[in-house]
Amino acid sequence: QFSDDPFVQDKITKMLKYNKFKIAAGEINADINKTYEGWELRKIKIVNNYSSINKQTPEYMVLDFDDKGKIYDINFGIMDNLYSDFVEQGLYGNDWGNRQVIVKFVEKYRTAYLSRNIEMLDSLFADEAVIIVGRVLKKTKIKDMYKYTKLNEEQPDVRYMQYTKDEYLKNQARLFTNQKDIYLGYNSFKIMKKNKQDNVYGLSMRQYYQSTTYSDEGYLFLLVDFNKEKPQIYIRSWQPQEWNDAALIKLSNFNLNQ
């Protein structure tokens, strides 16, 4: 039940408007899992349709419930094989709770993109740390918690990183306004734990999008810290059309600013 929740109503309306999804035929074999904030119903099979780029994509929908059984959020989920890999890594490293929060954040981020929610993208790429649990991202007053160090001369400097973030947001705002269809996917998606620093993770994704008249690809890196009361993102970088592995920003580029 979510009929009296304006947030969920607005979100599912935009998900449907921009992705024209339909529930897939056949039996629904969904999973119910405990989460950081409540419960989730995972693996509802749907199909998204993007007519102007001649694309149909199989997707999973994830419903989030509070402890009283009320739906408080809805997102497109990552595919089952990738999700299973992250569960296995979390069980092996005894940190599935942290990895689950990261997975669910990525699902919220991708859903915001596919729903053309520029406000959430603006929050994600803010200079301040951002709390990533909850239905919306919340900025904090914390800045410069981590220090960036280039590992080689092929990696970008801080000014270039800021420029590419700003350009990325400008491009997305234009795309969201001008394109009939937009699809966002990932060619790679990795979660890494920082050595010798508890509860700090790097998230790297090779992200691509197709739209009615334009397509692009790039490398997105996020640093997530679980050492505060609520998990936060401190670092985010976007490297458009970067293929050189030596130039990619990694978790090893960052250390606590002491």
Where are these regions (language model features)?
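Surface-exposed, charged secondary-structure patches
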Residues: 7-64, 145-216
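A short, surface-exposed beta-strand/turn
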Residues: 57-71, 216-233
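Short, solvent-exposed aromatic-acidic interface loops
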Residues: 75-85, 208-211, 235-251
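Short, low-complexity N-terminal intrinsically disordered segments enriched in polar/charged residues
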Residues: 69-115, 123
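Acidic/histidine-rich, surface-exposed loop or edge segments in extracytoplasmic proteins
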Residues: 1, 90, 103, 140-156
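Extracytoplasmic/secreted proteins, especially bacterial periplasmic and envelope-associated proteins
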Residues: 7, 11, 97, 101-104, ...
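Sec-exported extracytoplasmic/periplasmic mature domains
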Residues: 110-114, 126, 130, 173-181
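Short, well-ordered alpha-helical segments enriched in acidic and aromatic residues
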Residues: 1-18, 116-136, 140-144
